[in-house]
A protein has these predicted regions:
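PLP-dependent class I/II
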Residues: 8, 12, 17-28, 32, ...
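Conserved N-terminal alpha-helix of the aminotransferase class I/II PLP-enzyme fold
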Residues: 88-121
Length: 421
């Protein structure tokens, strides 16, 4: 067989395969076809594929603490296993864990909740999705400040709602103002999603900024705020502030939190909402049909995490703050990058738009996705373009990694972008 014949057969097989893939995709539900794949997971997968090929890639694309779950928490889980604590759990979570969450909210946040106002889920991601599905009807609007976590708009679309983006860019430290919020509200607005400390930017809303937003919300009936506080304990500027603290706002707020970031328990999959009882009942009804209650052993581990010493949380926070200072210093030394100092979480979100239109002779950078891919392919550092987060001028780096990895990654980035002219 001639080479041309082999090429023809190979091309025909590829065409048939693609046709089959697209035909199968067309049979998926319309609601599923509205969704986009996770850009953060896609970049992490690309990084893993390169590593499997023997390429030394530093992965700064994943939002996950690099620390291990503290030993005492693991021992609590082992004891639960030894005690045969392995049956189906109640849909809203075990009462003892919900009591521990109520105590946490009282002691740390000065917020008064009852056990019936707490619903424990399979991670904070499910908590967010439960809330959106329970409150947002077809065609209703959800205001999302941009930059935003990649899953927020997808969850709104899944519920049949309409994401309404409010641009809160680099020059305003990635925080939506009260005036912007007021201007975005329409008769169709049902919810605002607020993440503080923020993924992807690390920005933290002050008490005064939250009060101004709360005043706007309270002027509008039947308007709720989903307050994603999963990075609460990774805060470098002082006490965490919750929008639910202001008079009248507890009835309008759905707090989302969990153990994944604060206690390095991402794989344990425990999150929760604290909300008015009628909202909790609605989310409980939904969760009862989707997943039922969360893992019994994970709940025992989470309960112990909340009621035991919090020194492990502070130790990790201090380590993240040190790494924050290191990556900010090194990023500021790279010509072309503009840097805001993150006040919480473990992300840096520098502006990279000065490189757009530049080329190394082989690759031209047109946007933040190009820039992130360039860093991966040429510098072997995995990041995520800001396009995925609703900000085309920036890109996200996670500094939830060792000091050595941060230093080497920033060295590679500096050397790689220096080739762009």
């Amino acid at each position: 067989m001639r080479k041309s014949d082999v090429f023809l057969v190979d091309s025909q097989l590829k065409c048939l395969l693609l046709h089959k893939i697209f035909r199968n995709m067309a049979q998926l539900s319309n609601r599923l076809q509205r969704l986009a794949p996770s850009a953060t997971l896609a970049m992490s997968q690309k990084s893993s594929e390169m590593k499997a090929q023997g390429i030394d890639v530093i992965n700064m694309s994943v939002g996950e603490p690099d620390f291990n779950t503290p030993d005492a928490i693991k021992e609590a889980a082992k004891k639960a296993i030894d005690d045969n604590f392995s049956k189906y759990s109640p849909v809203p979570g075990y009462p003892d864990l919900r009591k521990a969450i109520v105590a946490k909210l009282k002691n740390e946040n000065q917020l008064d909740y009852t056990v019936n106002e707490i619903l424990v889920s399979n991670g904070a991601k499910q908590s967010v999705c439960n809330t959106v599905m329970a409150l947002v009807d077809e065609g209703e609007e959800v205001i999302i400040p941009a930059p935003y976590w990649v899953s927020y708009p997808q969850m709104v679309l899944l519920a049949g709602g309409k994401p309404v983006f409010v641009e809160a860019g680099f020059d305003q430290n990635f925080k939506m103002t009260a005036a912007q919020l007021e201007a975005a509200i329409t008769p169709k607005t049902r919810m605002i999603i607020l993440c503080s400390p923020s993924n992807p930017t690390g920005s933290v809303y002050s008490k005064e900024e939250l009060k101004a937003l709360a005043d706007v919300i309270l002027r509008h009936d039947d308007l709720f705020v989903l307050a994603d506080e999963i990075y609460e304990h990774i805060n470098y500027i002082g006490k965490h502030e919750s929008i639910a603290q202001f008079p009248g706002m507890k009835e309008r707020s759905i707090i989302v939190n969990g153990v994944s970031k604060a206690y390095a328990m991402t794989g344990w999959r425990i999150g929760y909402i604290a909300a008015p009882e009628w909202i909790v009942k609605g989310c409980n009804k939904l969760q009862g049909q989707y997943t039922s209650g969360p893992c019994s052993v994970s709940q025992k581990a989470a309960e112990f995490a909340y009621i035991s010493s919090q020194q492990c949380v502070e130790d990790m926070r201090q380590a993240f703050e040190r790494r924050r200072d290191l990556i900010v210093k090194l990023a500021k030394e790279i010509p072309g990058l503009e840097v805001n100092v993150p006040e919480g979480a473990f992300y840096l979100f520098p502006k990279c738009s000065s490189f757009y239109g530049k080329s190394d002779g082989e690759t031209t950078i047109n946007n933040s996705t190009d820039f992130a891919m360039y860093l991966l392919e040429k510098g072997h550092v995995a990041t995520v373009g800001g396009d995925a987060f609703g900000d085309p001028e920036c890109f996200r780096m996670s500094y939830a990694t060792s000091d050595e990895n941060i230093k080497e990654a920033m060295k590679r980035i500096a050397e790689t972008v220096a080739k762009l002219k």
